[in-house]
Amino acid sequence: MELLDHDIYKGPVRERVTYTIPNHPYLSLTVHHSRELDVDLKDITEEMIIDSGTLTAEDLFMTRGLRFCDDSVLWAALAEKVSVEFQRRGKTTMDLSAFMSLLERLTFEDETSAFYRLLTKCTALAHFSILEYIVDGEKRDTISAHFNRLLELLDSLFLQFLMLRNRSESNTLLTLFDILPNPKEIYGDAASPTSVLLKHFLSDYIFVAYASSYRFVSSVLCSCDQCRASLFRIYLGKKDSRAVNISDISEFDPADLILGQLHLDAREAVALRAEIDRDLGSSLILNSMERRHLPILHDKQLGRGHFERNILKVYCNIVLCLFLLRRVKQRIVSDLTAIARFFVKAISEMERCIDTVSGLHGVRIKLLVVSSQFEIKDPMRVPRLCFFFLEIVTILVSGYDKERHRVRALLEHLCLKKICLGDLCASMRLAREIRHDVLEGFLNTLELSYMSNPVRFFRFHDCNLYGTHMWSGVYPNVVPYAVRGGGSFDIRLQEHRRRQKRIVLRRRLIRRVQQRGLDIREARRVPKLACVTFI
C-alpha cells in the first residue's frame, strides 16, 4: 500500500493550545499559534509517565535550553552508549570528533543565555567522556571496550603461547620461545590477569621483541614461497624493503613493517588496513571473539607442520594485537587530552559569564577548582574529573526551568501509535524508535549507574581500562586462569560453559524482543505519512 499524506492535527489554528497529562498537572505543555494534535491523552498510562522520566536529555543528562529536536538527537547519541540494548542494526556509535561536531550544531531556545549554552555542551561532553572511556558492563561500541577486548585477547594468546612452549621438544623451537618474552610466564607459572600485568603488555620491550623477530620466526616455522624468499634475501645480505622501523606508525601502507610481518598477502593486507583505518580494528576483534576464532590467519594453511602452524598463527595475532593496543591507547590519551583542553577553555568562558546569572556567585570557586584540575598532566583522570563537574552541574541547573520535552516525548509516542512521522534526520528517527520501544515496554528504561551509585562505578582505577570483571572467558579455546583455579577442573569448566551459554541466550533473547517490538510497532501504525514534522 502506498503511503498517503495524513494530517496529525485537528481543527483550526489556535492562539494557545495546552496539553496536560491527566492526574499530573505539573506535566503540561503550551503551544502558541498551532493546531491541536489529534490524540487522546487518556491513553497515557502511569507506567508510561514513569518511564518517560529518562527519555529526554534535559531529564536524564541535565541539559538545559535545547530545542526538542536537538534534545532528542543528543539523547539518542548518548543513550546508545549507556547500554548495548539501545544500539540499532549494527550501527556504529559516535567517536569524539563526531560528537564534538554534534555539539557545535546544537541549537538552543532564543532566551537561553550564553552561560547555560556552554554549560549544556560541557555537561553533554562530561557524560560522553564517562560513557566512552570507562569500561562498564556489556557496552561494546566504545573505544575503552575495544581496548579491554584487546587486553582479554592478548591475555588468552599469551597463555596459548605458554601452553605451546610447554609442549615443545625441539631445541630450535625452545630457542624461538626464549627470544619472545611472555608476560604470562612468571617463574614457570601462569600469572593471573591484573592491572600491573596488563600494563606490561604495552611496554616497548614486549612490542619490540615480537615486532623485530618476524624473519627468524617465519624462517623456523614456515616453508612457504614468501618465507623462503625472505630467508634467501637474508642469506644474500639484501635488505628487506618491507622492514622500515619498529616504532608505532600513524600513517602506514601494506608495505610497512607491521602489515608486512603478519604473513598476509597483498589483498589481505589491504583489507586489514581498511579495518584499522575505519575503527582501529574494533569490528574485526569483536567479530573474531564472538565467533571464537583468531582475528587473522584463522583458516590459512601455513607452517612446516600442524604444531608450527599453531605457533606462527598465535605469534602473528599477538603482533597485530600489540600494535592495535598501542594505537588504541594512543587514541584514548589523545582524546582525553582534547577533552581536558575543551573543559579548561569552556569553564574559563563560563566563569566570565556567571555574573550575568543570578544566584550562582557561590559556585564560581568550585568551577575554578575543577578547571585547575583539568590542567593536570595525567589525561587518564579526565573521566573522573567529568563526574566531579557533573556534581557541580546538579547545583547549576537546579534553578533553571525545563523546556517540558518530557510532555513532547509522550505526545510523540501517541502520534507514533497512529501514523509514521516523516523526518529526514536518522538520529531523530533513532531517538523516536528507542523512546517508543521503552514506552511500549519492549526495552528497559535507562539508568546512569555512575550517577546513582558512583562509588561502585568508580571502584577500579585507570578508567577501568584494565578491569577484568567483565571478561567473557574462554577465547580462543583457552580456559582462563580463574576457571583453572582450585576445585575439580571438569566441574569448573562445565560451569563456565553453562555461564557462557546463558550469556549467549540472553543476548539472543534481547535481539528477539527488539525485533518483536519493531514488528508490533509497525503493525500498529496506520500506513500513512505525516505531511508535517512533529512539534
Swiss-Prot record:
What family is reported? Belongs to the herpesviridae U4 family.
Listed name of the protein? Protein U4
Organism for this UniProt entry:
Human herpesvirus 6B (strain Z29)
Q: What phylogenetic lineage does the species belong to?
A: Viruses, Duplodnaviria, Heunggongvirae, Peploviricota, Herviviricetes
